[in-house]
Amino acid sequence: MSILTAENLAKSYKSRKVVSDVSLTVNSNEIVGLLGPNGAGKTTTFYMVVGLVRQDQGKIVIDGEDISLLPMHNRAQRGIGYLPQEASIFRRLTVYENLMAVLEIRKDLTPQQRREKADELIEEFNISHIRDNLGQALSGGERRRVEIARALAANPKFILLDEPFAGVDPISVSDIKKIITDLRNRGLGVLITDHNVRETLDVCERAYIVGAGKIIATGTPEQVMNDEQVKRVYLGEQFKL
């Protein structure tokens, strides 16, 4: 089993402390939510784990290795996959070419194995019918499926999803949830941050709630929903799944 941990993270911008002493853990085979009100520090925390923002204090560790100083591409080699909020698909490449663009970097695979892996992912994600479509021609839900399939092409241990429900048609939300659950069932650890609180809590097994730069609650969705401080600063009294 693999473990991804963030330990005592802190980040300031000039004199403003955005994140203070935040720690979290994601294990293989689980879905974890990182949530909180706007300006609470959740996105900065998420970006520190991804490698987009350098922490002032604390460290990021994967399977006992400190990766805090590694750039994103080296973190990817250690097993961290990342799906950004904005469209990351190569718009002028077909779906198949998008997958092969990542698989070509896999030195552990032969050319034949790369082609076979692309075919497997296309079948698994039910995107055979758009295999030869350009990225720019895909719907929001199709694009998300291709982007997640492409992230898996790198064979990650963990996948970090930034706003996976953003820009997705309501009819596709259940598809995205199923894909996220399938990622967990493959043995991956999944960390999600999203403004769509209801959908995120519905799919995750544990959640961390960030408030004013600190973790104010952690536990199952039911536990954090019933936390009085979380109700007061984030969810309100009437929130239900």
From Swiss-Prot:
Keywords: ATP-binding, Cell inner membrane, Cell membrane, Cytoplasm, Membrane, Nucleotide-binding, Translocase, Transport. Pfam families: ABC_tran, BCA_ABC_TP_C. Its EC number is 7.5.2.-. One of its GO terms (cellular component) is plasma membrane. Residues 4-237 form the ABC transporter domain. Its main location: cytoplasm. It is found in: Cytoplasm; Cell inner membrane. PROSITE patterns: ABC_TRANSPORTER_1, ABC_TRANSPORTER_2. It is a peripheral membrane protein. GO terms for molecular function: ATP binding; ATP hydrolysis activity. GO terms for biological process: transmembrane transport. PANTHER family: CONSERVED COMPONENT OF ABC TRANSPORTER FOR NATURAL AMINO ACIDS-RELATED, LIPOPOLYSACCHARIDE EXPORT SYSTEM ATP-BINDING PROTEIN LPTB. Part of the ABC transporter complex LptBFG involved in the translocation of lipopolysaccharide (LPS) from the inner membrane to the outer membrane. Probably responsible for energy coupling to the transport system. Component of the lipopolysaccharide transport and assembly complex. The LptBFG transporter is composed of two ATP-binding proteins (LptB) and two transmembrane proteins (LptF and LptG). Belongs to the ABC transporter superfamily. Outer membrane lipopolysaccharide export (TC 1.B.42) family. This is Lipopolysaccharide export system ATP-binding protein LptB. The lineage of its organism: Bacteria, Pseudomonadati, Pseudomonadota, Gammaproteobacteria, Pasteurellales. The gene is lptB.
